[in-house]
Design a protein with these regions (language model features):
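Positively charged n-region of N-terminal signal peptides that target proteins for export
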Residues: 2-10
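Thiol/disulfide oxidoreductase modules built on the thioredoxin-like
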Residues: 111-119, 125-171
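N-proximal helix/coil linker or "cap" segments that precede and/or mark the start of modular domains
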Residues: 22-43
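Hydrophobic beta-strand core positions in alpha/beta domains
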Residues: 67, 99, 143-144
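Short active-site neighborhood of thiol/selenol oxidoreductases, capturing the structured segment around
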Residues: 57-74
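Bacterial N-terminal signal peptides
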Residues: 12-20
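Structural microenvironment flanking redox-active thiols in thiol-disulfide oxidoreductases
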Residues: 77-116, 126-133
Length: 175
């Protein structure tokens, strides 16, 4: 009985992955980017390390790159410099890049970002509740929220955001 349940879950997961792969391939999406259903983005109201509040509701009218990460996460550590590299490439009136640290101390976050991404001002999810609400299914995870506040794309795992294929993708969706 237990093997049947495991087999059914495995087959279901494989079908879901095949669907996501086919959807991405049919839309010409870069590797690892999944199209989402356009549901409204969950609430996101957090403070940065200076205590300044940031609310996703006030970002209406522009795309938002919402990135969940942690300093202990190996793929996050490799990916963060590529986010730092794209930060100055896009006008904040078209694309706002938001990096959200998941439940780590400010000292840990400051030490890590000072070394690899000094221009990024992280939002601090100190209690992990925003991360829980967004359900990223692992770290790193990046959601692309459209100007109407709807979830359009998800990238799970690390990727070189500063590579031509991802830069072209972002440029295309924000135009």
């Amino acid at each position: 009985m237990r093997q049947q349940g495991t087999m059914k879950r495995t087959i279901g997961l494989l079908c879901a992955l095949l669907f996501c792969w086919h959807s991405a391939a049919s839309e010409g999406l870069p590797k690892g980017i999944m199209k989402l259903d356009g549901r409204p983005a969950p609430a996101l109201l957090l403070e940065d390390m200076d205590g300044q509040a940031w609310d996703i509701g006030k970002a209406r009218g522009r795309w938002v790159f919402v990135h969940f990460w942690a300093a202990w996460c190996g793929p996050c550590r490799r990916e963060m410099p590529t986010i730092q590299a794209i930060f100055p490439q896009f006008d904040a009136s078209e694309l706002e890049i938001v990096v959200i640290n998941t439940a780590e101390s400010e000292d840990t976050v400051f030490e890590f970002l000072a070394a690899v991404a000094p221009d990024l001002n992280p939002l601090m999810d100190k209690d992990g509740l925003v991360t829980e609400r967004w359900q990223p299914r692992g770290l790193p995870a990046t959601f692309l929220v459209d100007p109407a506040g709807r979830l359009q794309y998800l990238a799970l795992g690390g990727r070189p955001w500063d590579s031509p294929v991802y830069m072209k993708f972002i440029s295309k969706i924000i135009e």
